[in-house]
Structures are given as structure tokens and as C-alpha cells.
Amino acid sequence: MQVTLEKKEGIHCSLLIEVPANEIDSVVSKEINRTAKTIKMDGFRPGKVPAGMVKKKYGEQIRMEVISDLIPQKYSKAIQDEKLAVAGIEVELKENKEGQPLKFVANLELFPEFEVTGFEKIEVQKPVVELTDKEVKQMIDNLRKQFATFSEVYKVVEKDDKVTIDFVGKKDGEAFEGGTANDIDVIIGSGQMIPGFEDGIIGMKKGEQKTITVTFPQDYQNKDLAGAETTFDITVKKIQQAELPEVNDEFVKKFGVKGGVDTFENEIKENMQRELKFILQRKVKDQVFKGLREIAKFETPKSLIKREIDAAKQNLLKQMGGAKGFDVNQLPDNLFEANAKQKVETSLILDSIMNSQEFKAEEAEVESLLDELVQAYEEPEKTKEQIKKNDKEIANLKALVIENKLTDWVLEQAKVTEKTEDFFEVIKENMQAQQAGF
């Protein structure tokens, strides 16, 4: 086998591979003879079909099957010999004639080689959130609202009321698609409508009509409406006031709590603290990763981005329960491209840093992280034992421990400032971030 390496711009190169004719023809001949012993053909007994007949009828097909198997073997050997770190590969067949050498080109995209420096340029704003009894009470009130009963009242609309409305949305004076609805129930202050919409209903009475002006968010999914100033003609048809259940032993049983109200409040606070800890870690980590992407200079392999896009599509399909009749591949790649590119770049950067630093996940550290994570489950010890039996889950935990250590290592060199934030705003931002990333 003859191999010629041709380097191209950036992370691209090609391998021109030539396989001797006698090697190809020998394998094809053996395959034809093997096929002749098993194939059935009219006029011949089983195993007695002449090889020449098989070659005449199936020779081209057999040759292509042989080549399809042989090509990956040959370029894999060439890649190994040349010591190339390949991210993606495309094969282009050049010459394929009987009695002639097989020639093909393997167009390669390589993993970039780079060193990350300038960690002191990374700026991180570390959120500081104080969790007080006030936030715990508000969380309990939110849970009470889930079991609220509503009764019609004849007063002006206030926060937490449920209103039944008709509305017509207009842009530049013309009604836009999807902007008209009748008999829609909206709980004021729930955030189910775009910012400003629910506030515009406060103070209205039953039967009242009103036109409000609202601006759609810049990141709204409908690009025709994103950032657009619109009006809504609103008619209030019904106003209902919420009545919240008392926080007593009967109420807390709805959440599987057996120890009464005090136990319930303690569990709520512990859950809030646990959730807050992981969200704040994620916020800091996201800033660190963003900073790393800004200081690291390299070309991102498109093949890796494409692979990540395909994985994101399959993940979306899984989230939709494998929706029948829905072809996820019909979704445009650019819908996923930005997130995919960020994930690939972050992964490459972390790998680069870990190759230069010795971060290890000690068994005690993995155990400690596992203990924290399982507290969110109803049966922590049972869940812990199940996870410990799963090698993949343990590998993920080890990777998370190392990722946390790497993040702390970067933070020691970065410019870190603190910013006081509200608990519920942090939770809201986290939910929005998760939705944006599918």
C-alpha cells in the first residue's frame, strides 16, 4: 500500500492511498469463489455454479462490497502510521478498475493542537444568594397555589387572580398569526404570557376592553415577532380570586411528608439550599467555560459540531417521547448549531487543560458528590446503591469531580467579583437557560 500525506490549510489534510491491483483482485476472486459455492442459480446444482458465471452476474457488486470493507481498514492503518488525531473523515474514490490499483483519497479533519493561556483575563461574577425564611415562605406559598381553588368575584383584576379573556394581537396595525385567542385563562403574575401582558390586565373589570402595548422578547422563538412592538386588544370576561389551602398536617401529606408542618418546612428549606448550590455552581462554571472559549484560539472541527447537532436532535426526540410521525432530521441544523459549537469547543478546551494538569477524582470525592446528589431522591440510599452498580454513572461522577476541580483551578487565576442576587430570579434564569438549550 502506498500512502501520500498532503497537508492543507488549518486542521485539514488528505491521504492519497493506493492499494496494489493484485491485493484487491485476489480478495475479489476469493469472494467470487466463496459465493459460487453457496449461491443458487437456475440450471446448476447447489455449489456447482461456475465462478465465471458468478463474476459475470455479480462481479461488480462483489467488488464494491470488498472495497467497502477494505477502504476503512486501509485508511485506519495509514492514520495510525502517520500518527494523526482524526476528528472526521470523508472518502473519495478515485480509481476502481479490475487489474488496476485501487486509488482513493481520505480527506481528514484533525483535532486542533493548542495551548490555553491568559486565565487571568477571564472575568467571573460570582452570585451570592441569601436564603432566608422569607424565601422559604414564598416557596411554600407557591406550592399552596398549586392546590388553590378559585371563585368568581366582581372587582378589579389583581395579582394572583385568574382571568378569562379574549385578545387580538396586532403588529403594525395588522393581526398576526397566532396572536388571537378566545376564552383563555391567565393567572396574573404567573409569567405564562410575554412580559408586560399580564401587568396590562391588572386594574381591569369584567366586561372591560382595553388595548395594551407590549414588546416581544429579543429571543422570542418566532423571529418575525422577536423584539417587535405590538398591541393587544383585550376583553376581560371573568375574574376569579384564589383561595389557598392552609399549611397543616393534611396539606403536607400531599407531598409525602409524614413528620408534620415543621418537618415539611425543614425539607423545603433543605431542597431549596441543595438546588441553589447546584445552580450557583452551574452559573459560575458557565462563566468560566465562556471565558475559556474567549481566550482559547483554535479552529473548531466541523465534523464534531455536526456530530453534536445530530446528538441534540436525537435528545430532543427522546424528550418528546419518540413522537411518532415526527422526523427530527427535518429540523434545520442552524437551530442547534450555536449550542453544539459551544459544547464542542468547551470539551476540546477542557481536554487540553486536563492534558497539561493532573486532576484526579479520588474515591472519597466521588462518594461525597454522590451523597449530595442522591438527597434529591425519595430513597437516597437505594438510589445510591443503584448508581454505584452502574459503571457509566460512576464514570460520569468522576468526570464531574474533575470538571469541578478544573473550574476551581481556573477561578484561582481569574478575576472574580461577587454580586448579590434574588433566589427566585436565579431559579427563573436557570429554567430559561435550560429551555434555550433544549
UniProtKB/Swiss-Prot annotation:
Cellular component GO terms, alphabetical: cytoplasm
Broad class of where this protein is predominantly found: cytoplasm
InterPro entries per the UniProt record, alphabetical: PPIase_dom_sf, PPIase_FKBP_dom, Trig_fac, Trigger_fac_C, Trigger_fac_C_sf, Trigger_fac_ribosome-bd_bac, Trigger_fac_ribosome-bd_sf, Trigger_fact/SurA_dom_sf
Domain PPIase FKBP-type positions: 160-245
A GO term for molecular function: peptidyl-prolyl cis-trans isomerase activity
Keywords per UniProt: Cell cycle, Cell division, Chaperone, Cytoplasm, Isomerase, Rotamase
Short name of any one Pfam family annotated for the protein: Trigger_C
Subcellular localization(s) per the UniProt record: Cytoplasm
Catalysed reaction equations from the record: [protein]-peptidylproline (omega=180) = [protein]-peptidylproline (omega=0)
Domain commentary: Consists of 3 domains; the N-terminus binds the ribosome, the middle domain has PPIase activity, while the C-terminus has intrinsic chaperone activity on its own.
HAMAP family with a match to the protein in the record: Trigger_factor_Tig
Biological function: Involved in protein export. Acts as a chaperone by maintaining the newly synthesized protein in an open conformation. Functions as a peptidyl-prolyl cis-trans isomerase.
Similarity annotation: Belongs to the FKBP-type PPIase family. Tig subfamily.
Protein name, UniProt field: Trigger factor
Species classification: Bacteria, Pseudomonadati, Pseudomonadota, Gammaproteobacteria, Thiotrichales
Gene name as annotated: tig
